[in-house]
């Protein structure tokens, strides 16, 4: 099964609408307050790092999915991402604690290098 590092590079602009119709930034470029590892109580620093205002995966480490502490029902997600050549990642949403892996309970917005990845576009 392909390895997916989910929630890849939650960068600069991520926001959700709360019940008071105010916008809430989930990542401010310097703090992971409000984020944690999937099925964890803390943030997985062994798999993620903050660098130059971006949240990045740590190369060579097993990917640990990150989620918000707060549960959202309606939201608008805006983000920027970078993906290495041949990369395969994604953004999961509406995840639950069901299953051992996040992809067992949540739909995914795929982030894939369609040109270079083996699962990408083909002639």
Predicted feature descriptions by range:
Residues 4-14:
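Sec-dependent N-terminal signal peptides
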